[in-house]
């Protein structure tokens, strides 16, 4: 079989930078899926993407589908011939349809009978006749929420398309992509190199674009180049560039020929909290801030131009002029905000509605304050600081700085709290109340911060559920799933001795009569328990382990986590499989018992050696298990219980539980019930697979 390399490029207007990677990856995934469906062999496939192009390169693509033998089964031999042994009309019709005679048909014998069969050879179709249609189908399936039309064209895409190139080796493949005929024409950089050129061979794509068109089409190469050059530029001025991957991705998606440059701003702006300056540089301008070795912001920034200029100083000056007004705004807002304390802004919270039925932001901070103090008392944190931090928690939302630079909420609250002379615990809680903000983010670690963060999230959860607006499907306008995961993570990762039932009840109490849903507390608890399952699954914990713990309904998240870890460890023990099966057997036996289960074991009724041994082993372990259960040392408890394997196996081998003698039967049921109860102190291990 012959092979050749394939290149497909779509030339467009500037594509959305935050969608570029996803578009390219989806294009590749969709196209390779088409190749697989068409039984076209290939060695490897990669995607390329730049602001004005999406491309795919497939290496060693088969030039045709492999020939196949297709089995075409006909009628059963019993019905293919009449009494005289002549072919029936049905058999002749089937044979004619396959281009053979009945006599040429083969016989297939199965356990269900004998059949006429024709093994037809089907020649593979040439790849070049399939590619264009496959590429179009791959494009049709791209995740484009809002496609657009352009010119008089009825075709829709995320941005206008100008060129399409499909090359199989050196051969131009005829066809259309999004209404554009395939041609060798490839567009270069807007301002450098050749505006367009003819591509002779699929293998020349990257090199020709770089040399002739001044475009680095390989996204990952472009990204790596920007990162390396930015790091070098920062090192030259004695600093380290803040190169966040999401920003690096966006910048790499904005330029085709990256040129890294260093600029500066007036040192007077460093009097403004660095977070506000960084927000402006990264969020608005897509610049990389630079910090010194002590983590202090330097009056410099690194940016990426999309052109190799003969006068880079002019480009640097232009970028400095662009950022200066934004930094001046931040300075003005900061100086203006400092004239008023956070406490003085409390009345203004009454003018902002949190939710129609749940009141204003002032109502919310009052509830957060009370709930934070309640939580702090249970965790040993400073309740006075927790109440104060809760009260002030949303006041920075009324500052000029946060209104203009919304992502600085909490952070600016921390800075303003320090300027107001609030305690450090209160100031830090102002910032950490929103943690964790995203998957993988850190959680608050200080006691006051934990109390405020939990209070804020629980107030929202109970309030929104309380007015009947729980998330439905994918819709979650109040980000309740994130809040729920946040509650669990804060409690688990800080090992806080908090009970969800108690917290939910207190939050509901603080909402007073505003909640219309009588089942709110139960629904919030169920919602949180469901998040446990999702969270632990994301961490790679087996579903059966999670279900085994969920069966016990532990409502203390830290305790839940201890049980998960213990059961996960138990599963690694050699005895776990047999004991899980035994517990399942015990559960099935006890489930059939009518009425209350017997609980008292009479030693005089233990007539079999195996049941005597099991009872003795349980009696030996129970004094050791009791303190372990009391201290939530579930891992050690299950390790001890694993030692019951031989006794349990022997019991089921030798003892008839459902004996005819009622007293013996009940005594054995009591023994099994006692056995099961020891495991149920931790989890229902009968659910382990």
Swiss-Prot record:
Keywords: Aminoacyl-tRNA synthetase, ATP-binding, Cytoplasm, Ligase, Nucleotide-binding, Protein biosynthesis
Protein name (Swiss-Prot/TrEMBL): Glycine--tRNA ligase beta subunit
Keyword check for Protein biosynthesis: yes
Broad class of enzyme this protein falls into: ligase
Subunit and partners: Tetramer of two alpha and two beta subunits.
Record localization: Cytoplasm
Family membership noted in the UniProt record: Belongs to the class-II aminoacyl-tRNA synthetase family.
Superkingdom as given in the UniProt entry: Bacteria
